[in-house]
Amino acid sequence: MMYLAPRDVSPATPPSPALRHHGSKSLYFSMLRERGSGAGRIDELTCLASRHFLSEKLREAATIDAGFPTDLRSLTRVLQDSHDETARGYRSYLDERQAGAPRRYFSCRSHALHFLRTVAPTKLVDGAWLFGLLQRWQDPRLAPLIRIYLEELGCGIAPQNHVLLYKQLLARYGCDQWQDGPDEHFTQGAVQLALAHNADEFLPELIGFNLGYEQLPLHLPITAYELNELNIDPYYFTLHVTIDNASTGHARKAAQSVLDCMPRIGDAADFHRRVGNGYQLNLVGMGTPQAVASFDLEQELRRIIVDKAAVGAQLHSD
């Protein structure tokens, strides 16, 4: 079937200096506040700020080399090679551990819990970037992406809703207080919410972002393995190891959507460039390796003492 280029392959709106003061954290929470006539609607100023924020992050992403293929005809093979490399890397990791090597990520249980809090702003909007596609539910090219979104929501089954699963994980281990984290904790989550609210203007970037996000990274099975070692439920992470596969899972659906949306008539080169830029957008902000490396034992101890002091200050008799 011959498809025309999506109508929103045109260049994104340039940013306005008046809206550059919005930090990732403040914008993140602003985009979570629904205001308007329908579900998921935000006020006009926040929408404008989100668009300019996204433009800035895409310019940052354009400087990153994420190995996106120069020929989309090789996309499936390149992604399969990446998946195979992850599998080999994980097997090598397991061999190292069985030979007596220490954990690669988490030095102790507190380190792991710190990680859960650090990545919470991202995990609690899992799949949100696909929200903006719902109005295009009749477009068969986007049907696989909408299917991914519904699966992220658990297809209406609460125990399978990814955001709910992560909320329950945080509550179970006393990690609910993630809202006071620094601005960099919120960058990737803000990117995902901004894509959700600007899907029309940034459709190629959204498709590329989804492609990158649904690949299976090496850090995911390692994280699950080490959480389990520390007696922390790894189910949220093992679930994603299962569904983000290159055979029949989200990674395969994401790749197929890129190929289906590739314009047969129109500027295919520009579409390719913008999809690649969206793919690289996954690497903007704090990812798992940076979140793991950000742990400081002394700082974490100070945080715990300060929190407990605030609660118990008026409860001592001496």
What do these predicted ranges mean?
Residues M1-D318:
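Non-heme di-metal
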